[in-house]
Amino acid sequence: MSQLDVLIVDDEESIRNLIAANLKDEGFNPKVAANSTQALKILSEKPVSAVVLDIWLQGSEIDGLGILEIIKKRYPLMPVIIISGHGTIETAVNAIKMGAYDYIEKPFNNDKLVILLTRACEVTKLKRENIDLKSKVIDKTELVGECSVTLKYKMAIAKAATSSCRIMIHGKVGSGKELAARLIHKQSKRVNNPFIIFSPTCMTTEKINQELFGELEKQANNKRPTILEFANNGTLYIDEVSNIPIPIQVKLLKFLKDQTITKPCGKNIKIDIKIITGTSKNIQDEVNNGKFLEDLYYRLNVSSLKVPSLYERKEDIPLLVKYFVKQLSKFSGLKERSFADETIAALQSYEWPGNIRQLRNVVEWTLIMNPLTTGNNEIIKPYMIPSEILANSANLTKLEDSFDMLSMPLREAREVFERQYLSAQMSRFNNNISKTSSFVGMERSALHRKLKLLSLHIPPTNRINDEEYEEANA
């Protein structure tokens, strides 16, 4: 347990130096701070293994409980041992509820503190190992997919992560805007600092104001840190930024100009954060309609990132389904199942208005509603997925219900089948001629001729080169 960094925060110099000397003799590497400013500066430079924190700090802007709250927000696993010379049972209980590892009263036996620190660091080490083990199976910042659209998107995220400018992420509901923000933070220089998510949706104007700036008159003496303070030195992601009311937009614009917030006590605090915003709306339309400040839009949209919809990433659906099945099996106790090729085809033919989130919900619903009847891995067939998916899967599943073809002559029935089959496959591969022809086993020019014969339209952007197209349609 040697050379573990321990931060000692106490306003009395003699006490903090005594604790530091004792801990150094026991093999720890102590650091000392007299107030919240010094303590938070040390933590921002390099997180420590544990903190010994006095509750009553004279001359400190934030008291011990306030520092504890900040630490548990920024560094959830960091153990904090509270010390106090004149505390109460109520204070001790509050500290434990807020996440303190333990509470001891001054004067205390040095051996007791060493035992507590050693135990706290061991427990934290086990927690970290457990989290690392889980992350090997499921990574919350893993972008699953290998199609060309996804690869380009991954490159755009990597490029955005190297920039220090503000980024606005545009994407439909459920497409993964928060994931994009997490990936940008994970690949940036701020990776070891806080990543804070703020969603103003369903909040009142007063609540948004309190969370961001902490300026409620009724709470003028409240020293609770704001969201901006929690995110200091890290990344703040504001989800659905267009839901912020105009009065708060004005304050946010002022903050972006000078990167400073004014506390109720009148003190100005400099904040260093990377701001990423997300929106499913057309912000330019919101500006034109007077619902969003134009200047704020330009300051937040310095760099723009578009999240592709699942409809644009249909080729990733097989990988996504496997990923969600494994995730649900690991953390929800559902049995792993394989999805039949025809089931995957049905999923690929659906338009997915709810994007990735909807696909995950469909996979979970399917596993729950179709429990294993044997100990074997029963294949998920098309009839097992939600009926609305089948009903809207671009006629793919209608092939199974075409009993009326039995009353047709062979040539007519074959034409009906080919039209339905090729229409479904074209939809499945986003009207991509090369991929569709490869899957169905036809030359591209032959597929073009067949589609023209069946009166199936091909978008110009998905045609082969003009020479080959003209030859196929000659």
UniProtKB/Swiss-Prot annotation:
One GO MF term: ATP hydrolysis activity
Origin species: Rickettsia conorii (strain ATCC VR-613 / Malish 7)
Domain Sigma-54 factor interaction: 143-368
PANTHER family cross-referenced by the UniProt entry: TRANSCRIPTIONAL REGULATOR (NTRC FAMILY), TRANSCRIPTIONAL REGULATORY PROTEIN
Stated role: Member of the two-component regulatory system RC0849/RC0948.
Segments forming domain Response regulatory: 5-121
Keyword line: ATP-binding, Nucleotide-binding, Phosphoprotein, Transcription, Transcription regulation, Two-component regulatory system
Lineage, uppermost ranks: Bacteria, Pseudomonadati, Pseudomonadota, Alphaproteobacteria, Rickettsiales
Pfam families for this protein: HTH_8, Response_reg, Sigma54_activat
Protein name as it appears in the record: Putative response regulator NtrX-like
Annotated coiled-coil segments of the chain: none
UniProt record, GO biological process: phosphorelay signal transduction system; regulation of DNA-templated transcription
CDD domains cross-referenced by the UniProt entry: AAA (cd00009), REC_NtrX-like (cd17550)
Gene3D superfamilies linked to this entry: 1.10.8.60, 3.40.50.2300, Homeodomain-like, P-loop containing nucleotide triphosphate hydrolases
List of residues binding ATP: 171-178, 231-240
Leader sequence residues: none
4-aspartylphosphate, modified sites: 54
